[in-house]
């Protein structure tokens, strides 16, 4: 016969398992080799998306993580661009410590639908050039970022695996293979950032 303490612990375990089955749990897997993200529901892939991960020297860390925080209108605290008084880009890939010539200013890079899973590293909407090019973050197409942002709560598991092979070209797949999930999340105005306009630099300088 189980003691009251063990009986209570077993009850909590069973209730927790039941809640996970009934309520479901979203998680995400990031494949750095194939440059793809997979949204999972109860360990079953329900949506996939192309990504842009960290470039050599700024590699996206591999391992098991959890969503630490979410920020709809996040901006990078380090990276951005330098523009002149007419808002023309002077320096595409700039950082906050870079000297700004007279008449110019530094603009922090927008990282909408930011989902941080490691210190300073997260998933967010951004430009996908077709190869790993970020400063460590994982860029997603806007539609995918909205869907992931709504589906993944703080605490959701994030698994990052694989490695970027050298001299490999990636084909960015933007087909709406996941239209049911896009429609479910993308059309929810609660998850629109102000303006919903992404204007990346020509060489994809954002993190």
Spans of features found by a protein language model:
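Cell wall/extracellular polymer interaction/catalysis modules
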Residues: 21-88, 93-106, 112-113, 156
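Bacterial N-terminal signal peptides that target proteins for export
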Residues: 1-9
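N-terminal signal peptide c-region/cleavage motif recognized by signal peptidases
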Residues: 17-19
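Exported/periplasmic cell-wall-interacting domains
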Residues: 59-62, 81-207
């Amino acid at each position: 016969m189980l003691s009251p303490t063990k009986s209570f612990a077993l009850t909590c375990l069973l209730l927790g398992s039941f809640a996970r089955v009934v309520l479901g749990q979203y998680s995400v897997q990031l494949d750095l080799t194939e440059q793809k993200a997979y949204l999972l529901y109860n360990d079953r892939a329900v949506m996939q998306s192309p990504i842009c991960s960290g470039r050599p020297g700024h590699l996206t860390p591999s391992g098991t993580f959890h969503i630490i925080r979410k920020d709809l209108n996040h901006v990078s605290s380090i990276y951005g661009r330098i523009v002149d008084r007419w808002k023309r880009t002077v320096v595409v890939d700039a950082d906050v410590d870079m000297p700004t010539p007279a008449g110019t200013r530094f603009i922090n890079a927008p990282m909408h639908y930011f989902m941080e899973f490691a210190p300073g590293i997260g998933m967010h909407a951004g430009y996908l050039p077709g190869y790993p090019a970020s400063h460590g973050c994982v860029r997603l197409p806007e539609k995918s970022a909205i869907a992931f942002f709504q589906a993944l709560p703080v605490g959701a598991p994030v698994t990052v695996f694989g490695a970027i092979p050298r001299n490999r070209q990636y084909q960015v797949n933007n087909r709406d293979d996941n239209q049911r999930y896009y429609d479910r999340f993308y059309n929810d105005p609660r998850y629109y950032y102000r303006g919903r306009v992404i204007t990346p630099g020509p060489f994809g300088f954002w993190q």
